[in-house]
Amino acid sequence: MPELPEVEVVRRGLEDHMVGHTIVSATVLHPRAARNQLGGGPEIEANIAGLRVSAAKRRGKFLWLELIDAPSGETRPDLGLLVHLGMSGQMLIKEPDAPISPHLRAKVELDNGDEVWFVDQRTFGYWWLGDLVDGVPERVSHIATDVLDESADFSAIARNLKSRKSEIKRLLLNQEIVSGIGNIYADEMLWQAKIHPLQRADRLSLARLEELLQAGKDVMTKALAQGGTSFDALYVNVNGNSGYFALSLNAYAQTGEPCGRCGTLIIRESFMNRGSHYCPNCQKRR
């Protein structure tokens, strides 16, 4: 599943290609693409045409387009199109005569003739059109800030983590504590901070927890600079290009490879129906 850096790459692409343009029409081609929408696809199609995209925003793994009334020029958006990429969703900028993808689920046409496609092979992603509350779609108002958010309070997040008697990796994956972190970046930030994934959060100092959050920010900033992490053709930016941070991973998917710090072989253990990758020497459980 795309995590924070991958979604941010897509958001930036949509910002470049959509902001300032008016949506001429929308077409929802698969019911699952609007499965959370009251009224389904027709509700999106009927209410989005004629609106102008004023901004492309993101929180964690969710992104949305802020929409305003084009004729009136209203500058305070109260409506947004939420996009969740799911496991394999792609938002692609296409010319009108581009060959149709068999996995095209929804699309919008812009006033400059470009089309924006939502391509989703596994159909876990979706669009949702709804109200913004304090600038955030109602549907994701419960999602916490992420480590790249300028408003993120690492001290407050660290206190929240320390108050819980649970494995630190489990908490990092909880989108209501800190958002945008999935299995890849949890493993990477834990490796950088030299913390075992099963270490209980309440047994870590506040200083160590803040170091961990800073490690997450550092790792994700580097990943963003490299276009995110792509292991297959399902994750691409709006132009269809893959990221290359997979070449810089230190822990995730590095089973049997020497640790970049000490040379001990990275191991993988099952965790929450997925795998945790870590160095048994650098990341000892305390």
Curated annotation (Swiss-Prot):
SUBUNIT field: Monomer.
Lineage top rank: taxon: Bacteria
Organism field: Corynebacterium glutamicum (strain ATCC 13032 / DSM 20300 / JCM 1318 / BCRC 11384 / CCUG 27702 / LMG 3730 / NBRC 12168 / NCIMB 10025 / NRRL B-2784 / 534)
Sample GO molecular function, one term: damaged DNA binding
Protein name: Formamidopyrimidine-DNA glycosylase
Catalytic activity: Hydrolysis of DNA containing ring-opened 7-methylguanine residues, releasing 2,6-diamino-4-hydroxy-5-(N-methyl)formamidopyrimidine; 2'-deoxyribonucleotide-(2'-deoxyribose 5'-phosphate)-2'-deoxyribonucleotide-DNA = a 3'-end 2'-deoxyribonucleotide-(2,3-dehydro-2,3-deoxyribose 5'-phosphate)-DNA + a 5'-end 5'-phospho-2'-deoxyribonucleoside-DNA + H(+)
Zinc fingers classed as FPG-type: ranges: 250-284
PANTHER family documented for this protein: FORMAMIDOPYRIMIDINE-DNA GLYCOSYLASE (PTHR22993:SF9)
Active site, renumbered: P2 (schiff-base intermediate with dna), E3 (proton donor), K61 (proton donor), R274 (proton donor)
Record's function text: Involved in base excision repair of DNA damaged by oxidation or by mutagenic agents. Acts as a DNA glycosylase that recognizes and removes damaged bases. Has a preference for oxidized purines, such as 7,8-dihydro-8-oxoguanine (8-oxoG). Has AP (apurinic/apyrimidinic) lyase activity and introduces nicks in the DNA strand. Cleaves the DNA backbone by beta-delta elimination to generate a single-strand break at the site of the removed base with both 3'- and 5'-phosphates.
Keywords of this entry: DNA damage, DNA repair, DNA-binding, Glycosidase, Hydrolase, Lyase, Metal-binding, Multifunctional enzyme, Zinc, Zinc-finger
Family per similarity comment: Belongs to the FPG family.
Gene Ontology terms describing biological process: base-excision repair
Upper lineage: Bacteria, Bacillati, Actinomycetota, Actinomycetes, Mycobacteriales
